[in-house]
Every structure is written in structure tokens, then in C-alpha cells.
Amino acid sequence: MTADHNKNATDNLLLLSSTLQGLTSEGINARSERLDEMSALEIAQLMNSEDQTVAHAVEKVLPAVAKAIDAAHDGLAKGGRIIYVGAGTSGRLGVLDASEIPPTFSASTSLFHAIIAGGQAAIFEAQEGIEDDRAQGVVDLDAANVTEIDVVIGLAVSGRTPYVLAALEEAQKRNAITIGISCNPGSELEQQADIAITPEVGPEVLSGSTRLKSGTAQKMVLNMISTGAMVRLGKCYQNRMVDLNITNEKLRARALNLVRELTEADKEAALHALVEANWNVKVAIVICKTGLDAAAAFDLIQSAGGHLRQALNEAK
């Protein structure tokens, strides 16, 4: 048994070694082969130059990103959630994006949920071994009580992380929409996900360190999906964050400036409207633009599904 086990482990390791060699993200970057001889400025210049290619790689997959935005919006509109699943750097990027949504859009903390292999401890300290645990991926996905109105986003630069693949497979059994974000074309994740987003950024400056260009590409895509979905839910007006969660003096000042900019009201009128609206920026804007009281302004916004532009159009 021991000999057979060792042979299987060796065979699996050799297979994985061959698989990694074939991944674009694991390749050798010819431009950085002198990396250990470079000056600080040369390293910065090279990394900056390489990073400039990331936006072009993401540009090529924008149609898929648009599908993901639509799927995320539709899921949220039905009362579902966006659930990120990842390991290592990819998992931490999911945690970061999910944590930024509530303060940016005054959204419930339940709308965006991040699952990272290894749990909360993995946010601060590497738990890399857990990424190979398919069973744990299923368990963690199950614990999130995923349903058919949720959207599950699998993050894995390699496109082969067992934990993530198993979680997405379980999500699909529950009829949830799945999105896969990787940086290697033709990967298992790309083939498995309902919507595949695969920006091909090429080999890293530091070979295999996918927290660099690959991580940047993932962050850019996540920015687009979450921001696009929330914008389409009515969380902004023009290009302003009008669904601020106002919790401090800086945000009160920002809210006051927003109301003044968008309504041309003077400072006193804008402040009065915000106080009447209990610091709800949308309600204050409707008050200033229409003369309605706070209750009527709130009802108008609610009837417009939270979309300020639609509410103002209906008030004309």
C-alpha cells in the first residue's frame, strides 16, 4: 500500500509539473531574465512596462465581462448574491472586492460574499495546501447556502485549482450562474464556467508570482463586474456615488457637495434637504429638484426601483 501510494503521489506530481509548464502564467518572461541583476529603478521600470500590457489583455475579454455584469445585475435584482470563491491571492482579491461594496454603495453586507480556501486565517497568512482540497470546496460552498438566484465567481489564475473547480461544480448543481476568471486559455475553469473571462497577461516578471500581472487583471475584472452591477441597480446618478453610507464628517461633507453639484442648490438649502432626508443623498436631491417633502421623495425613489434618474424623470 505504501509503495503504491508513493508511486501515485509521484505520478501525480510529475503530471502536475507538466501541466504547470504548459500554463502561460507559469512561463518564463524573457524581459526579466536579468531581474536579480537590475537596479531598483530598472525593476520598477520593467514592472511598470509589463503592467501596461494588462489593460490590453483585459480589453480583449470585455464582451465576456459585459455578460458577467448582466448576470451579476440580474442575480442581485432577483434578491440573490454575488459569491466569490478563490484560494491564495485570488481568494484575497475576492475578499477585497466584497468588503468594498457596502461602504461604496451603501449596500447590505450580505449581497457580496467571499469564500477563501482556508477561511479567515488565509486572508493574513498563506494556507496554500487547502487549494488542493476538492471536498472542502464543496463544504464551504454548501455552507454559503447557494441557490439558483446567486452568482458564483470562481477565481483561479491557473484555471485548475481543485478547491475552486469543486465549488463551481457544486454551484452548478444548485443551478447558480457561474463565472470563471483565470489567465490561462483552455483551462478547466474556462471550460466549466457558464461565463468564462480569461485575460491572457503572459508570463510574470517574477516567474510564477501570479499576484503581479495576473492579480492585477483579476482585480480589474472584479472592479468592472461589481461596479457595473451596482450602477445598473441604481446605485449611482451620472457618475456620482449617490448611495453613500454616511458614517463620518468627511462623508457628510461629500454628501453636501454632491447635493449642491447635482441640484445647483446653495449650501444652506442642500444642508436643510439632507437633514430632512436623514442624510439620504438621493432623497435630498429629489427634494431640492422637485420641492417634494422627504416622505414623498423617498416614495418616488422607491417606485423607481432606486434609480434616481428615473425618479426625477417621473417627477417632471
Predicted segment positions?
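Cofactor-/ligand-binding subdomain signature composed of acidic, glycine-rich
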Residues: T2-A57
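A short, well-structured juxtamembrane/interface segment
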Residues: K60-G75
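Glycine-rich phosphate-binding loops that contact phosphosugars or nucleotide phosphates
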Residues: I83-V221, A229-V231
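Short, amphipathic alpha-helical interaction segments embedded in low-complexity terminal/linker regions
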Residues: A229-K316
